[in-house]
């Protein structure tokens, strides 16, 4: 009965039928006009737009999601161990209370106030960053923070310094914002700050992008001496340090070095992190920490592209931090990923040592692996794909054409069995390539 009534309502709303009281429902005397598609004209989802627009080709990167295939990623968490039960428990407890219905409406474009306050304490305790909620903007992940910072700093162009090897998404974001990239060497101690100083003497530098804890992609840690030097240069030359601390929580050898933001006495560091890097990529909650006037400007810019995040999820994450759920998950994940790193290291030694060179990362979720110069990652990747293994695209790691022949191989999201299977396929592909 409900279906029939709904159908009648729809037909009446479109003008196909008319109801006359005490008589019945009849086909309308004047039917709605239907304009059939022109003969021979086909329109589908892949049709070209009938208007002009800008295609930013420099942002286009191939992306193929192949969930049915075994994948060695760039280094992401294992979503199978994500604390979903805890997240849902907190989410339900918030949304089930009638007086919390207000959280389903529009909220602050700075992010949930309670999470900002909780994060201020959390970042002080875990990273030594002295801040208040006015210094924090809740984002949908560190990439949003990177976009907002780049747009505000480089709206009128200017120079940004990045590593010779660099996180490609950051390079693209800076370039798209209008920055001209200047590259410096990266060695076992991270970005070469003497190179940065030399560039500062030649150009007006607006920003320096750094992944201080584990350089992306090579995984090296910026040394204490270079951290101090970089902060001094920022104060001397007045540039912003864009510190992307994407995997601070995963360090296996010792306690991690505190971020640059913890020793920022002149308000030059914009610090970006993400809860999704600890839990799972789909849990889109991150944060940006910086001077309060900059955070306010970023919040107003954020309002134009996203308005706000998921208030209830943000509150749930705040409760997880307050009650220690996030910290317990981090400790559990750290132990597991440490074991997986060691197992992956053994597999690389046992099966791929004649083809590659690498250093064991002290933290993070990936190895930086350099292939022999006579071998080609592109051919190897194609052979792997034929055997249902996906590996990262080597082109993402050498945008400056330095010829290092390296890629990142993530280990955290694969259990021992999956790691073994993947490395055996990779070994077979490398043997085939070396024989040709």
Where are these predicted regions, by residue range?
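A generic "structured core" feature
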Residues: 169-173, 230, 237, 241, ...
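N-terminal basic, amphipathic alpha-helical segments
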Residues: 1-92, 303-310, 321, 331, ...
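Short beta-strand "wing" residues that participate in macromolecule-binding interfaces
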Residues: 18-20, 131, 391-392
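Conserved active-site segment immediately N-terminal to the catalytic lysine
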Residues: 256-275, 296-297, 407-408
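PLP-dependent aminotransferase class I/II
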Residues: 269-350, 357-359
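Conserved core of the PLP fold type I
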Residues: 96-237, 249-250, 255-264, 337, ...
């Amino acid at each position: 009965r409900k279906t029939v009534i709904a159908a009648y309502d729809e037909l009446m709303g479109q003008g196909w039928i008319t109801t006359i009281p005490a008589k019945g429902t009849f086909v309308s005397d004047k039917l709605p006009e239907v304009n059939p598609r022109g003969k021979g004209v086909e329109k589908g989802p892949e049709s070209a737009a009938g208007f002009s627009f800008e295609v930013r080709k420099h942002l286009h990167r191939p992306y193929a999601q192949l969930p049915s295939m075994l994948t060695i990623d760039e280094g992401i968490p294992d979503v199978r161990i994500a604390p979903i039960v805890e997240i849902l428990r907190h989410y339900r407890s918030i949304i089930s209370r009638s007086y919390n219905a207000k959280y389903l409406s529009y909220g602050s474009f700075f992010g949930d106030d309670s999470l900002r306050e909780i994060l201020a304490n959390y970042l002080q305790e875990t990273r030594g960053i002295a801040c208040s909620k006015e210094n924090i903007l809740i984002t949908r992940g560190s990439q949003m923070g990177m976009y907002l910072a780049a747009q505000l700093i480089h709206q009128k162009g200017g120079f940004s310094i990045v590593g010779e090897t660099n996180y490609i998404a950051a390079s693209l974001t800076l370039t798209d914002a209008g920055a001209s990239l200047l590259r410096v060497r990266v060695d076992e101690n991270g970005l070469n700050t003497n190179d940065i100083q030399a560039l500062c003497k030649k150009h007006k530098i607006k920003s320096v992008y750094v992944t201080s804890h584990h350089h992306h992609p090579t995984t090296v840690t910026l040394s204490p001496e270079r951290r101090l030097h970089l902060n001094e240069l920022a104060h001397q030359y007045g540039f912003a340090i864009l510190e992307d601390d994407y995997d601070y929580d995963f360090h296996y050898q010792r306690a991690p070095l505190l971020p640059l933001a913890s020793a920022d006495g002149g308000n030059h560091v914009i610090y970006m992190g993400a809860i999704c890097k600890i839990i799972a990529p789909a849990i889109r909650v991150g944060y940006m920490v910086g001077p309060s006037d900059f955070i306010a400007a970023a919040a107003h810019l954020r309002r134009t592209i996203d308005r706000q995040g998921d208030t209830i999820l943000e509150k749930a994450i705040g409760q997880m931090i307050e009650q220690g759920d996030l910290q317990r998950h981090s400790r559990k994940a750290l132990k597991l990923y440490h074991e997986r790193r060691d197992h992956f290291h053994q597999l690389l030694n046992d099966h791929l040592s004649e083809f590659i060179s690498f250093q064991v990362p002290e933290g993070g979720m990936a190895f930086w692996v350099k292939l022999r110069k006579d071998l080609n990652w592109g051919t190897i990747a194609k052979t792997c794909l034929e055997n249902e293994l996906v590996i990262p695209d080597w082109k993402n790691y050498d945008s400056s054409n330095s010829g290092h022949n390296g890629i990142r191989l993530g280990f955290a999201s694969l259990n021992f069995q999956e790691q073994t299977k993947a490395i055996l396929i990779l070994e077979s592909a490398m043997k085939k390539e070396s024989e040709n």
